[in-house]
Amino acid sequence: MNLKEKTRALFAEIFSYPATHTIQAPGRVNLIGEHTDYNDGFVLPCAIDYQTVISCAPRDDRTVRVIAADYDNQVEEFSLDAPIVTHDSQQWSNYVRGVVKHLQQRNNAFGGVDMVISGNVPQGAGLSSSASLEVAVGTVFQQLYHLPLDGAQIALNGQEAENQFVGCNCGIMDQLISALGKKDHALLIDCRTLGAKAVSMPKGVAVVIINSNFKRTLVGSEYNTRREQCETGARFFQQPALRDVSLEAFNAVASELDPVVAKRVRHVLSENARTVEAASALEKGDLQRMGQLMAESHASMRDDFEITVPQIDTLVDIVKATIGDQGGVRMTGGGFGGCVVALIPEDLVPAVRQAVAQQYEAKTGIKETFYVCKPSQGAGQC
């Protein structure tokens, strides 16, 4: 039974009437463009075929009722006429509450909803299960009540809910790609303007995500330190963001910067350039050049931004040794663990899976998780 069938069946069973709509919103993986989003730079993610699915129907009152199928059918209920506050024990429900609260501030022309939620985006793997949930909930209200909100506004609403209501800092990329993703394409997103350009993916290429399953510990504090270092760099150049600094301008005065800040700045500037070039390489179907850019990106994250760990570097080395120049591999996500992403010809997937299975656990003592994904459509009815 797929997620649509599961949520529709559960909806009818619990609410004793049929759902009118089923909405999905996907998770995502970032192919290249790491730690560039909060520097007003470029990212190149694609939506993946793991998603949050919600079967739903409008109510004729002001109550929102939610069933979380993945949490033992926990029930959540709140009124649109009372102040929406955080739930003490059900963390999942705060994503729903936050999205609805921020939607009210944008456009209050909606009533109550019954919904059943289920998803298969792996949690804690850096594949944006939370953004997928936020965008799915926003799309439910937009579709049921014909709200005049586009995908970018639904994405911004989700980001606000996560930052201000749930209390977790994030850029806009995760929600934007979940809302705007296009089947068989990646999106080159300009994080300053939120402009997005669809980039076609070469035929016969698989998006492979391998979770190192190394438990991330430093990610919060180190993330904030990296942001501060980037802001220090932008101030040195008297620019609003590192997006506005050229590599030439940086190279001319790099020796005057604090050495650590200089390394952080160099990563962001070079990563922005790589990301724009990667979009053009993908569009041309030049997997070899894409692989070189992904290798440079990983080296920059390892040596200049210093956010990889030995387990991640080991995974990258195993994959690279298997595929040679027929594709690329790099760490993806915030760093200090998490996943690597590889773009490889579909016929090489079994060899990569086997090499990783034979070598990674032997070298690190940790068993990986292996996902083969397809670039998928963004949020909407399913």
From Swiss-Prot:
* InterPro entries in the record: Galactokinase, Galactokinase_bac, Galactokinase_CS, GalKase_N, GHMP_kinase_C_dom, GHMP_kinase_C_sf, GHMP_kinase_N_dom, GHMP_knse_ATP-bd_CS
Residues at the site labelled Transition state stabilizer: 28
Annotated residues for binding of Mg(2+): 130, 162
Q: Report if keyword Kinase is assigned.
A: yes
Which residues does ATP bind?
Answer: 124-130
Q: Which annotated residues bind substrate?
A: 34-37, 223
Where does this one sit in the cell? Cytoplasm
EC number(s) recorded for this UniProt protein? 2.7.1.6
Q: Which GO terms describe its molecular function?
A: ATP binding; galactokinase activity; magnesium ion binding
Keyword Calcium applies:
no
Q: Which organism is it from?
A: Salmonella choleraesuis (strain SC-B67)
- The protein's name is Galactokinase
Question: Which class of enzymes does this protein belong to?
Answer: transferase
